[in-house]
């Protein structure tokens, strides 16, 4: 499982602070929906009919116990007590209040998690087999390759505005 280092933590914290300011400006009417849309999509936030939806990255589908606890805490405090795991091994919160999203992102950062590039037309979360690294019939552990792709593509300016979303799985 990937472990954040000081660089990762600082990058995610800076992104959380930036999005918190962008959200404040949007709610104050200083940013239009057209201006806010690409900013929220870069941070995993969709506007749906009934409420916003926040998608959280789970790199290669691996969670530690303390990360799962953090997700449960977020679901209890900011949503309806549950999240939805996706086929891409992410988790979605379907009922957060827009004004709470910056706090959710800050809580995720404390658990070494984020929502960067989980929506919009970019390279999405890289997935692998849920038994990667322990399967008896595995020829090679795909997780190091997933991590190389994740580091290479995350926040890469050439992949921020693709014509469509791009999904990668390494088996």
Give the residues covered by each predicted segment.
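Iron-sulfur (Fe-S) cluster-binding modules
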Residues: 1-54, 66, 70, 74, ...
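Small-residue-enriched alpha-helical segments and adjacent helix-cap loops
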Residues: 27-31, 51-171
């Amino acid at each position: 499982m990937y472990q954040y280092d000081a660089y990762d933590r600082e990058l995610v914290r800076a992104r959380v602070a930036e999005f918190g300011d962008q959200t404040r400006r949007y709610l104050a009417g200083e940013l239009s929906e057209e201006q806010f849309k690409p900013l929220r999509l870069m941070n995993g936030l969709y506007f749906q009919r009934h409420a916003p939806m926040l998608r959280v990255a789970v790199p290669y589908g691996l969670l530690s116990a303390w990360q799962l606890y953090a997700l449960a805490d977020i679901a209890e405090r900011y949503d309806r007590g549950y999240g939805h795991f996706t086929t891409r091994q992410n988790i979605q919160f379907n009922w957060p209040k827009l004004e709470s999203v910056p706090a959710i992102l800050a809580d995720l950062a404390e658990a070494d998690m984020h929502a960067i590039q989980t929506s919009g037309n970019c390279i999405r979360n890289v997935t692998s087999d849920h038994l990667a690294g322990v399967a008896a019939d595995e020829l090679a552990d795909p997780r190091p390759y997933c991590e190389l792709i994740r580091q290479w593509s995350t926040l890469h300016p050439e992949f921020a505005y693709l014509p469509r979303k791009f999904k990668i799985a390494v088996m």
